[in-house]
Amino acid sequence: MIYHKHLLINAKIDMPIKEEQKAVYFLSNLVDSIGMKAIITPVARYVDKPGNRGMTAVVLIETSHIAFHIWDELSPALIQFDLYTCGELELSKVLTVFTETFRPLDLEYVLFDRENGFVKEASGNTRGLHESDL
């Protein structure tokens, strides 16, 4: 069966990833943890442009993509994360790997079912997120 799940995360973090190999590891670990299959090796690059300084990373998966950018000039740093899949998605697994890696100070997420438009399936933030939800 084909699904259309789109997860967006916006989080503030104290210790942003600045090394490309750590960003690649995060994406590889996430892909494995959620039972997806990468169709290319994850790619990460540090962008050293004032106003847009930070890490950008992407991996193509059989069912679409996972990407993020971290703006580390900000304090705390900001990460925008995007996962789209035509496969099943266990939100709790993604949130667990994300929070274990980035230890966000503040986190907001929204999961859309895009089968017939943009139907909000789930949303939350650190103020309402409990370990039992992960």
Residue ranges and their predicted role:
Residues M1-L134:
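Polybasic/polar functional segments that serve as interface/processing modules
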